[in-house]
């Protein structure tokens, strides 16, 4: 299944706020109206919606998300927590969380168009897994800096997660450590996502 490119507001009206997909918010009470219209949700639908929430927020294809779930399942620790860490440490998501891109699709475009350096080298793979002590910066070109400055100027200036440091005047961010789960930028029950996939096999 390909990456979603359809109407974004339609998704947030059904699934709730998805800040990685769009900075728009559903109108207050719209989720309650949808719920009353559709009646009581089945357990399958609840798990499906949590999976969709994760997929659309991080801008993943179905195949990509399944791959991350399998990697997380083989790692030590809680599969759900490891899954969120893997997704949060993607380069496109790090750029978004730093405020250097307005959304994750916007961050992906910056990376694809070779505007971004990791540790001084161009990285054009949005799924690149960032590590502690990585430095993420704009290329030393006017166009790259303008794109990032525009995003920094329009970002909502929310509190930065403690695993990241932003140096806005240098168009640069630092990864201090692996993300703590309490700083994940999405209201999600990751265990339901893991359950969804475990029941598909």
Curated annotation (Swiss-Prot):
**Location in the cell:** Plastid, Chloroplast
One molecular function GO term is:
rRNA binding
Q: Which GO terms describe its cellular component?
A: chloroplast; small ribosomal subunit
Q: What name does the UniProt record give this protein?
A: Small ribosomal subunit protein uS4c
* Gene that this sequence comes from: rps4
For the biological process aspect of GO, one term held by this record is:
translation
| UniProt xrefs under InterPro entries | Ribosomal_uS4, Ribosomal_uS4_bac-type, Ribosomal_uS4_CS, Ribosomal_uS4_N, S4_RNA-bd, S4_RNA-bd_sf
According to its UniProt entry, this protein's organism is Lactuca sativa (Garden lettuce)
Q: What does this protein do?
A: One of the primary rRNA binding proteins, it binds directly to 16S rRNA where it nucleates assembly of the body of the 30S subunit. With S5 and S12 plays an important role in translational accuracy.
């Amino acid at each position: 299944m390909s990456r979603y490119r359809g109407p974004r507001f339609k998704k947030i009206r059904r699934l709730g706020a998805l800040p990685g997909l769009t900075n728009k918010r559903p109108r207050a009470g719209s989720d309650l109206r949808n719920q009353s219209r559709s009646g009581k949700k089945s357990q399958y639908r609840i798990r499906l919606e949590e999976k969709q929430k994760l997929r659309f927020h991080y801008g993943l294809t179905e195949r990509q998300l399944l791959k991350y779930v399998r990697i997380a399942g083989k790692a030590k620790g809680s599969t759900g927590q490891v899954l969120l860490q893997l997704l949060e440490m993607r380069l496109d998501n790090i750029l978004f969380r730093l405020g250097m891109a307005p959304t994750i699709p916007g961050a992906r475009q910056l990376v694809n168009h070779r505007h971004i350096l990791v540790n001084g080298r161009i990285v054009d793979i949005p799924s690149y897994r960032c590590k502690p002590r990585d430095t993420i910066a704009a290329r030393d070109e006017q166009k790259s800096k303008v794109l990032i400055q525009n995003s920094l100027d329009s970002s909502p200036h929310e509190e930065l997660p403690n695993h990241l440091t932003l140096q806005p005047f240098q168009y640069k961010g630092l990864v201090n450590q692996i993300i703590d789960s309490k700083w994940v930028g999405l209201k999600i029950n990751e265990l339901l996502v893991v359950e969804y996939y475990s029941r598909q096999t």
